[in-house]
């Protein structure tokens, strides 16, 4: 054997080096995955801890970037020629597929992180040849560097593409920060085969056609629906049902869906010029010398008129690089016949086409083609709900243009959160209901003396530490770092649906809110100037006062940070249906689970912690502290490993780790455990899976041991206060 085949250290035949070999996950596939809590660390980010993207973006000459993008649109490159001499449709598809991974069920996906650059999205079958779009953008990204992220640039390129083809957009907001490693927290499905149909193992469908939550795409590797129809079956009516379900899960209603489909397909064409078997591997599987590009095709020239992408071939309308009513006009004007594309895909061609509606070839001006529609397109004509909407848009071009512009803005900005995060000169002034608007601060804020006085009044109101802490947690912990929704700002906990969620114990919640509203009313009425306190601030302040009181009960003097400035949203600013997805079906921090789930309780806890942007130590200290503060749902004693009441001690960890206790499952509930004295057999404690995992899981136990040591009390209080403040402030983008 050649010396080159041997390890330079051991001299043995080379094997995978650092990070290779059989992994813990291979040995123990059911091991709790805590890695999702430690993604995107400073160790993977080349920009450094002091880098402030928002400040850099503010220095960007956005107008100059847009001019460069407009120029690029028609600067066709030989290595990847532009269809019809215009890259606009390609960039629209790139931006659309960047944003289109968003699903409202858990808020994950979307354009906000630039993750299309990384696996798995850079190699998804539905993203075929979008690697070329990003490579075309590289000179512009290279020119402006750190002042514009890839995430922002991809969306901006889509906007400029639309504008360059004749439609003014609704606006653009910057502020999306790039990630630098693949996102591990996003569940894309369980299938082990790209584009697996619903009859394959580990399908995302059950029942007649019930799509697994929180997924929105119909197949692994697709962004939306299968354009050929459900599982490739060319049935427009059935396709309409898929389209409706998928777009609804992306937070789009029927009118927005029709506008997006019809508006998006006003531009460009599909590519299926030949046998898909001639297309090479995706970027992540491509040879090193391809330099990050994939899908190299040996069909003809492999580009231009020989391009193979989706497998469907053709354009929807006569002028594919101009905003007009051509798509809807052609859709309703003609009957359609089912054919196979050169790549073998199901598609539809218009019958008996007038010459004026024939489409000039994208690369040969001497050729013309009949307009094409996908099965999904035809759902706009045959679905009984979509059809009248589409006809109305056809008859009202201005309404259609406005509907598409607004829906496109929503599509590309949905995961950014509130307007407070928007940057740049093109931010629309209009408040939109899906942005969860909150009134701007219009009064003088409370000062340190007011804060101290209000805390004293709250503690003297008769509300317990448990009530104060639980209410503040219920308000703030709705936040999702995935799409920056939820949180305490706005005090929407007083409105439906949040006030009625089971986890919030509605009757108990109303008592607390009424008491706090009384304190708010008295304080505001007693001010001679314009000073006020919002209920949103008072809810959080009450929680902070409760934590401080519990720390005092433990002999610690803890000052919990508090920054006023939250405002109270109006009920008309609150879309109840939209907020319903924020309801916790399980909240391990409150030892709550609405029902039995196939997923283990500790996995649901980690998922929730990740949405709250918590690390494993933060999750650990919060669970241990909240148990001591009486924050359990229904005043349950599960996990309350202490004989003290409302006292912020490290008893949870001390007693959890006590070898004098032996644990066994409860005879009444397999997810509840009983801890008995090892010697006497006397019952000492009860706990759930969420409680015991901090003693069972080796990584979490290592953290728990830090807080369970004799010198752990002080650090426990400090770390709990810091983690508490983090959760209370997650939505305070105004403080950034």
UniProtKB/Swiss-Prot annotation:
Subunit (UniProt): Homodimer or homotetramer.
Similarity remark: Belongs to the peroxidase family. Peroxidase/catalase subfamily.
Top-level division of the source organism's lineage: Bacteria
GO biological process, one term: cellular response to hydrogen peroxide
Region (Disordered): 1-25, 294-313
Site for Transition state stabilizer, residues: 93
Pfam families, alphabetized: peroxidase
Cofactor binding note from Swiss-Prot or TrEMBL: Binds 1 heme b (iron(II)-protoporphyrin IX) group per dimer.
The protein, known as: Catalase-peroxidase
PTM remark: Formation of the three residue Trp-Tyr-Met cross-link is important for the catalase, but not the peroxidase activity of the enzyme.
Catalytic activity: H2O2 + AH2 = A + 2 H2O; 2 H2O2 = O2 + 2 H2O
Encoding gene per record: katG
Residues joined by cross-link Tryptophyl-tyrosyl-methioninium (Tyr-Met) (with W-96): 224-250
Entry cofactors: heme b
């Amino acid at each position: 054997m050649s010396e080159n085949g041997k390890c330079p250290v051991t001299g043995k035949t080379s094997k995978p080096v650092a990070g290779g070999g059989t992994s813990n996950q291979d040995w123990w596939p059911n091991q709790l995955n805590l890695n999702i809590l430690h993604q995107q660390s400073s160790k993977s980010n080349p920009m450094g801890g002091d880098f402030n993207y928002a400040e850099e973006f503010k220095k960007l000459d956005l107008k100059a970037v847009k001019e460069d993008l407009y120029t690029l649109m028609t600067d066709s490159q030989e290595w990847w020629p532009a269809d019809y001499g215009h890259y606009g449709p390609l960039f629209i598809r790139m931006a659309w597929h960047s944003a289109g991974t968003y699903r409202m069920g858990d808020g994950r996906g979307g354009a906000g992180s630039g993750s299309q650059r990384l696996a798995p999205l850079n190699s998804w079958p539905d993203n075929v040849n979008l690697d070329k779009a990003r490579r075309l953008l590289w000179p512009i990204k290279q020119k402006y560097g750190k002042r514009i992220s890839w995430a922002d640039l991809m969306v901006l390129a889509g906007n400029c593409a639309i504008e360059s083809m004749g439609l003014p957009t609704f606006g653009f907001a910057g502020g999306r920060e790039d990630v630098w490693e693949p996102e591990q927290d996003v569940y894309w499905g369980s299938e082990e085969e790209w584009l697996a149909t619903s009859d394959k193992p580990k399908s995302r469908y059950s029942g007649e056609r019930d799509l697994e939550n929180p997924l929105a795409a119909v197949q692994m590797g697709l962004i939306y629906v299968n354009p050929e129809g459900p599982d490739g079956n060319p049935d427009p009516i059935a396709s309409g049902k898929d389209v409706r379900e998928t777009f609804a899960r992306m937070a789009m209603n029927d009118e927005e869906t029709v506008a997006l489909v019809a508006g998006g397909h006003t531009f460009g064409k599909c590519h299926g010029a030949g046998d898909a078997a001639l297309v090479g591997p995706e970027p992540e599987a491509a040879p090193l010398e391809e330099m990050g590009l994939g899908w190299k095709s040996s069909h003809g020239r492999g580009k231009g008129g020989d391009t193979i992408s989706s497998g469907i071939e053709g354009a929807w309308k006569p002028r594919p690089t101009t905003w007009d009513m051509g798509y809807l006009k052609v859709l309703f004007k003609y009957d359609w016949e089912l054919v196979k594309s050169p790549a073998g895909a199901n598609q539809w061609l218009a019958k008996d086409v007038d010459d004026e509606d024939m489409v000039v070839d994208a690369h040969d001006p001497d050729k013309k083609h009949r307009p094409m529609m996908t099965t999904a397109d035809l759902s706009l004509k045959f679905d009984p709900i979509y059809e009248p909407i589409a006809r109305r848009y056809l008859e009202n071009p201005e309404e259609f243009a406005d509907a598409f512009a607004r829906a496109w803005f929503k599509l590309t900005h949905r995961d950014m959160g509130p307007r407070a995060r928007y940057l740049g000169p093109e931010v629309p002034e209009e408040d939109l209901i899906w942005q969860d608007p909150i009134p701007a601060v219009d009064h003088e804020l409370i000062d340190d003396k007011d804060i101290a006085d209000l805390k004293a009044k709250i503690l003297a109101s008769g509300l317990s530490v448990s009530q104060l802490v639980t209410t503040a947690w219920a308000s703030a912990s709705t936040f999702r770092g995935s799409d920056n929704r939820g949180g305490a700002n706005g005090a929407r906990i007083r409105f439906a649906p949040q006030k009625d969620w089971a986890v919030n114990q509605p009757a108990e919640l109303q008592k607390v809110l009424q008491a706090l509203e009384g304190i708010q009313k008295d304080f505001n009425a007693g001010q001679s100037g314009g000073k006020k306190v919002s209920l949103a601030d008072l809810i959080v302040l009450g929680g902070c006062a409760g934590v401080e009181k519990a720390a005092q009960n433990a002999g610690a003097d803890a000052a919990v940070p508090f920054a006023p400035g939250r405002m109270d949203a109006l009920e008309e600013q609150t879309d109840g249906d939209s907020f319903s997805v924020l309801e916790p079906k399980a909240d391990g921090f409150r030892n709550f689970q609405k029902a039995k789930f196939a997923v283990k309780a500790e996995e649901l806890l980690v998922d929730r912690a990740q949405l709250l942007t918590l690390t494993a130590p933060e999750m650990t200290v919060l669970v241990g502290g909240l148990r001591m503060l009486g924050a359990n749902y229904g005043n349950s004693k599960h996990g309350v490993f202490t004989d003290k009441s409302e006292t912020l001690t490290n008893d949870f960890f001390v007693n959890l780790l006590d070898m004098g206790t032996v644990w066994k499952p409860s005879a009444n509930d397999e997810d509840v455990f009983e801890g008995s004295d090892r010697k006497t057999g006397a019952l000492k404690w009860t706990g759930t899976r969420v409680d015991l995992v901090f003693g069972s899981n080796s990584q979490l136990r290592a953290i728990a041991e830090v807080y369970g040591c004799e010198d752990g009390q002080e650090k426990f209080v400090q770390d709990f206060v810091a983690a508490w403040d983090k959760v209370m402030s997650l939505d305070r983008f105004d403080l950034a």
